[in-house]
Amino acid sequence: TVKHILSKTNDCELTGVQHGDSQPNAVDLRVKKIFEINKKSPFIISEEGKTHRGSTEVQPDEEGWFNLERGTYEIIMENVVSVGEGYAGFVITRSTLNRNGLFITSGLYDSGYHGVMAGCLHVRVGPAKIKKGTRVGQFLLFEAETLSMYDGSYGIGKQHDNKYGEISGS
């Protein structure tokens, strides 16, 4: 069952929600930062650990526009989410981006996750210009049987998320 995260009937919270962000079944997410993923460094993963490729922050121009060429980027939203027990969530792309050759992929937000909303922005047909603060994704929350709470390497206070700097709502 899909639930609305802004409903008072769940133990979940989403910060940074602005007027107009609440949609009938989801909440719009606004872009805060974009990092270009390093294409030359290998990504290494095993059951023993992982080594990320690394990335470089894309600076918006003086008017707040991110100028993006075709490629894959790590995208950071203005929002921080806390997913309560019995729930999970994921991010989908807003349809306007999808119809223009851009899409966002994101992992599952497990019960117990508290942290930054992030994912990969794939610019399949470039170039693209996205203004900082623009609504680019939507967060969907749903009921999920919880066998244990999230204890991974992402989230507020975790090493990976330190590169994002000060995050409001933490």
Residue locations for each model-derived region?
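DUTPase catalytic domain/fold
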Residues: 1-170
